[in-house]
């Protein structure tokens, strides 16, 4: 139990009580160890407590007077049901206990793994036998996912597994007010689980089930679509709130439901909600209250309150005080509606600017937060300030208890809140309206007997006194209990409802002989006071706030309590009976009792607030029919549901509204529009899309409608547009030399000057959000990447600058790497290492278990400028460094593996790979590669659980070609996939994966290798694979061209008359791709039909809609293309000659229409749209005589796109979509079986007129797995395919001894050699399993284990085989981008938004679900939760990354594109990732580098 050490005692969460008189009874019980989890069962005298060091649990049945150990039970923590006062759980490592009679009897049950450290138990609010139990999450491969069990009989029978791969689960009825009194959804459970086919956090889904996940439903949000990227959820009063996080953004979308059937998108006006930056607070029965952090580095927030259905949030308080853990100084006074205490930061400007320490002031509201005022002390001028939730000194609520109107706190008078130890104890008996000094010095305090007794104990050191008052704590009413010893109080508590006259003080005292012992002091005031009579009560006490002394109206009524008079020295003595208020209705008030009606949006605040029709506003039935000019409709206001005010106001009445304002304004035109903007300059240097969070449906959310592009011209002027190029403005008024968008946070962008000044925005340049910081030194001048970003910690930046480089030619000029953990702000730069070529953060979401601080750098040996490079590593910002490799040419980090190219003594390259950034293993290449002088590698792709690597065979200029080899699923053993693949001198390879589909790729091969080796020109043909490189074949040419004429060769003979298309090596713009991730199965290309690929000038434009099986020629000549609205519209524009028009198709290329965008011809260089291809806007970039231009094309006005497409996942073909399954052209039997399964994708029906809108999840389902056939296998290591397609041993090789793997002591068995290995993507089952043809044998010494364990599970195999070989697994979607001209084409993987943190398990310390009114801290639970159990070492975690078209080698600077893709061609799930993946690892020109 050592792992429980260091947990603070704070335990009970909403406790309270009191004490007083002649001689209260005092009983002391000593304990041997420190205590935690002191808690009462509600409405009883039964308490539990736990010893920290050994987990022993003790029970008291008489309110802490006597204690007995519960035999044979030792736990990690205690969880008490918040809804049943007889039920509690003791959680052990694997054995747990439950009681249904307040701990008199305990029944045990077991789980396979220990409980989750974060949220181990889910209680059902209405059935005490229904419980969820969450096991500890597996964070080994990240993001952390775990198993949840359920019971419906209170663990009388063994718990059953609910779901295996969940982020979190809860009952729908997880809070008392949710569906209260409704007889539905009793068994409904909501879980956030792994994606349908992915473990990445961006794919997490919210699923519901009414039959324990035998069947599930994914709820649709207010957009009518399901939402991926679900991060968290919490039950708050009558609401459930779920948070979704978009990829490449820390911004969250909040969704709220009151019944789990319909969900609303919560809108916060202009404010964005970010992960780890908001706290859902204790809310009212009719609204949700959320505190939103205003700055990443300053713990301050703004408090927002929702309307009654949780949709619109308005700001109530600015600059609330928060702490790092997400706790907020906010408390609703218990039992009294409308009274709220907060602490705000007075010097917020100085705190934000210079990090000055905070000056706090306390404020109180009596109208539910609509207005706030100072705290005043009776008879004194000046303000009172109190310590609140961020500085807890006791369990339970901070200020209040169910005792009506009696409030206490520790604080001081003066200008600001001082130190706790300088504070005194203050009390108010009018709910905070006025205060008086109760006791000098800081004290812990409690309320008892509905406020008749107040107890306090000194809290600044040891004391031998306990103080109590029977007169509401008035100054001279405090009496003393003298103890025989001095104690240091740790906790003071009583019954949660504060009705008891018995209290418990948990404390420590000095022991004889040194040291301290722990004691529980029981205080009993029962026999001191007489029982109160009727005359001792005030029957209608209330918070008298109005100027005339009338009770305040909250929610349309006054609240009245029967309360003991302050000077009546008697006890109420109604044990376990909570004070219940009476209500009197008030007259309705138009400001206080109303909110905006449905489909109306609030604008303005306070008395200026208006309710205006929202975008989804629609006319009442029959209104505006015929010639009607007006209609009667809602005033825009409605009475807040649940409000009990009487009478009517003008806001209840319908108003006359004009018909012309009623409907949502249609687009100004039903045609395509274009807008041309001219710019000075000769070239566009860089352009980037900053794509908004596509997760939020944005229907009513103005801040989510922008389509932002930033652009730099060669005049060093940066421009920005928020409407996709209709209007442009200068981004900053300064000379800009580079633009860096943040790879992992699409809201962030950086504008670099030639000096140290850097401009940046964290909100896509919206809302005047462009600020600046000073870099430590000017940018480097060596054409090296200047900025590197962290996949998870979005404010961590590595800056590669130049020192002593101000003067050109200075010999002392060299590179230095710096790091900032504060986005470069507040002079936060630390020096890392000098003389470096590149540095990169190593942490990734997918399973690389390293510290977030881990950095790899390439540094010149001995810090000498021209010395060879070393690969060095550090996880403490290079206070210590570890040299991993010498003579390094290049390294690349992908999502799951790191590869390093080093130069051997014979000048050949060697490739090493690592899974964990610590242990590296040399890659095993096909045997005949050992004869090749390996001069360059290009990493092509690893999106299909295997790495594709191009190894250069002929490096001679203009004659380059090489072989594509493909790895096994852990990236270390390679086999031949395709020989003689074309490459150019910059390391680009003619190879491209089809986006959005598994296993389809196109490559160009050199067919006259022998002649080329003798100096001849290359002849090229195109090849396509439909099974991830196992089989390649020529492309099938169409029978006729676009003029309906046959080609002049026999297209049936594909070898001599195939379709050949131009690839990367010849593209004028390497940013273009054949396909789009959101237009599944569609590809466009330029090429020709014939025996070989001809010149670009002779090419025409072709298209396929079935993933490359059949093609058709769509236009003569070469065109550039873009996909819009996920393939709903395709736009093509003439390339390489002047034009004034584009063609577009809205039916997947069946028909093409012309649109003229200019009155004269201009030269168009490129066409672009948002990376996810979800927009109906496009940009043409080009030159018109001496000016640059950008043309916006807007297709959103077309009638075809006026309604949104309907998609029902349960009946997908019912609406506007079909299901489409890709096929393999060579498979006669079951051609739709690809990779062992039939995949089904959503595709919009060709003839429907609607827009896709919000991005849809293209993959619908894996319909079924297929039986294994030869197509599911490729040749194993040491084997190659012969002309008949069989796998034969490479000539001249003898087979290695398979038992040699037994030399590794972790390996217990081996397979005999087989000729085949399964394609890593394949999920086939049964049939003919070609890779199992070799028998499995035990290693010597493991025969017994072999017999016992045969068929060991995948996870064990993973540990036994992958880790011992330090394998590198290449998984991740890759897209590309181009960085710094030098690095050429980069395909990069996908950053994630995961997060991990080490923390003490909060439930071990705090057994109830709220800390001083804190109901749920969504932001303080990042998306991935780290483990605290002692047996799970280190930081497990999620985040992101992936690999790219990393040319591995070479120094040649390549194309003159100075951008990363110039258009962050991240395209949805394929996204911009590591700049380091863009480099050629080794090259014939690279000798000078080492």
Curated annotation (Swiss-Prot):
Family, as annotated: Belongs to the VPS10-related sortilin family.
This protein's name: Vacuolar protein sorting/targeting protein 10
Lineage, highest ranks first: Eukaryota, Fungi, Dikarya, Ascomycota, Pezizomycotina
Listed GO biological process terms: Golgi to endosome transport; Golgi to vacuole transport; protein targeting to vacuole
Any single Pfam family the record assigns to this protein: Sortilin_C
Family matches, as Gene3D superfamilies: 2.10.70.80, 3.30.60.270, YVTN repeat-like/Quinoprotein amine dehydrogenase
Ranges facing Lumenal side: 22-1354, 1427-1490
GO cellular component: cytosol; Golgi apparatus; membrane
Segments crossing the lipid bilayer: 1355-1375, 1406-1426
Annotated Basic and acidic residues bias: 1038-1048
Chain positions covered by the region annotation Disordered: 1016-1048, 1465-1490
Summary of the function given for this chain in its UniProt record: Functions as a sorting receptor in the Golgi compartment required for the intracellular sorting and delivery of soluble vacuolar proteins, like carboxypeptidase Y (CPY) and proteinase A. Executes multiple rounds of sorting by cycling between the late Golgi and a prevacuolar endosome-like compartment.
Origin: domain of life: Eukaryota
Keyword annotations: Glycoprotein, Golgi apparatus, Membrane, Protein transport, Receptor, Repeat, Signal, Transmembrane, Transmembrane helix, Transport
UniProt biased composition (Acidic residues): 1474-1490
Compartmental location: Golgi apparatus, trans-Golgi network membrane; Prevacuolar compartment membrane
Membrane topology (Cytoplasmic): 1376-1405
Mapped BNR repeat ranges: 97-107, 364-374, 426-436, 719-730, 1102-1112, 1143-1153
Signal in keyword set: yes
Leader sequence residues: 1-21
